[in-house]
Amino acid sequence: MRLSIALGAVLTVLIAVQGEETTNSTTKYIDYSSLKKFTLAPTIQQSSTDGSQVQQIQIPISTRPDPRATEAPTPAPTLAPTPAPTPTPTPDPGPWTTITIDHDQVKPFAQPEPVTISEKTAVKFKPQLHITNGCHSYPAVDEAGETGGGLKTKGAPSAGCKGSGWGSQVYGRSGWYQDVWAIMYCWYFPKDEPSSGIGHRHDWEHVIVWIDNPAVENPKILAVTPSAHSGYHKYAPPNADTIDGVTTKVAYDSKWPMDHALDSTSEAGDFQDLIMWDQLSENARRALNSVNFGRPNTPMNDGNFQPKLAKAWPFQ
């Protein structure tokens, strides 16, 4: 009897405990919301040995930065290229205004040291000028572009023009013409007066020396053409007694009542400082391209140089 009561009590206790555990037990889950997010690596598939199953293995890769890595330097900003400045256009100087001064106040250009082949050749073949009668040659223009006013035709043919106290000038310009190198040498005279009262204010005369090639060691004179009354004397080749080495000799002469002209001569003459067209100041070139000297004209300016070479061409 006592044993039955004891067993019943034990059984009652066990049932009560089991019921309490059953009541209090719940399914527990892992809260993933507090975990870091992971990036899954690509899936790796593995086959089982019997080929019945395929196992997939995913390896989580943390996106958290590696503290051992150094930060990439911030690149310097690329600046836009600076555009080249637009050059200021050269203003149009407008028409040339002639400034005239006394013929004996025009200062010549000093003869520059020749640099180019054409300059050296022009100096080498610079001619001698012999004044038979009439005026001596004078500078026509100065560095500022002022030009000589010339002289009236009165008094003796050489009155007032027997030479400038500043020195004289010969002007030059050269270039190829029909495969021959032409060097033009020009002189200015304040008046052309064969005798008192006749002639004209201002005079320009020139001679063209034609050579084979300025670049060879010993260029050869092929022809000489002195200017004469709007035309030319043409010597191809020149007479031997009119050449001194490589120097052409020309005379400024008037056969009355004709105006003055140049011609080849055997008489020795004088040299003048040579200034080539490209060596003149800009104002001097503008003046010689623009100033009206009356009946005579500037032989070597832009409008006359090529036409005069064509007219003086000495070869048939």
Curated annotation (Swiss-Prot):
Family, according to the entry, reads as follows: Belongs to the Necrosis inducing protein (NPP1) family.
The protein's superkingdom reads Eukaryota
Question: Domain comment text?
Answer: Key residues/motif important for the effector activities are degenerated in most NLPs, including the nlp24 peptide consisting of the conserved region I (11-aa immunogenic part) and conserved region II (the heptapeptide GHRHDWE motif) that is important for phytotoxic activity.
Protein name per its UniProtKB record:
NLP effector protein 8
Keywords in alphabetical order = Glycoprotein, Secreted, Signal, Virulence
Q: Where is this motif: Hepta-peptide GHRHDWE motif II?
A: 199-205
Free-text function comment from the UniProt entry: Secreted effector that contributes moderately to virulence during infection by P.capsici. Does not cause visible reaction of C.annuum for several days after inoculation, but by 7 days after inoculation, small necrotic lesions become visible. Leads only to chlorotic areas, without necrosis at 7 days after non-host N.benthamiana leaves infection.
- UniProt-listed InterPro entries: NPP1
Q: Which organism is it from?
A: Phytophthora capsici
Name what induces it. Answer: Expression is induced during infection of host leaves, but stays low compared to other NLP effectors.
Q: Where is the protein found, in the record's own terms?
A: Secreted
Q: Where is the composition biased (Pro residues)?
A: 74-94
Q: Where do glycans attach?
A: 24
Give positions of region: Disordered. Answer: 62-100
